[in-house]
């Protein structure tokens, strides 16, 4: 059983209830809905090293989320749903295929945006 599979099994069984950091980095093709079981406690979510190209529209259900890493995935644009996560301070989408960063994807409280090794030609004027 892979580490990610074991972590998902532990998440499904409730063994991870109350954790503040979750690392799921091992070839996931879609966002595991089980993550929402941690909605009231999760602060750091690492989904790097997967095959993701989108995040769920209801990501803001993770009300305490401060940091999200989605490096080395298949994103072509920074997901606009990130702006609905009001506690989000750090976003890392290194080594994807991001070409576009829409102003609507930038959360007002965002302090760090990591887009190294992408294909972004311009950033929104709202980023200073």
Ranges and model annotations:
Residues 1-117, 121-125:
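The feature captures the LRR N-terminal capping module
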